[in-house]
Amino acid sequence: MSFLTAGEPEVRAWTIKKGTTAPNAAGKIHSDIQRGFIKAEVISYDDLIKEGSMVQAKEKGLVRQEGKEYIMQEGDIVLFKFNV
């Protein structure tokens, strides 16, 4: 399965196994993100497309704050918050 990250320079898909927690998914990007994991801001792909922008999705409360126990879902779009 895949999750997505998005920013100014690129949008990227990352492949993970089903049942992967948010910190372990963060580790696919960089071990420092996994080690310093604080939370993940998550929205489903379908919700983002429906709303048209992250700003509108946030205004409607569709962006969730998830912790270390969160199990990643297919098509999640994620912004990882971390501190190392």
Label every model-predicted segment.
Residues 73-77:
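Structural motif
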Residues 1-71, 83:
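C-terminal-of-GTPase-core extension/linker across diverse P-loop GTPases
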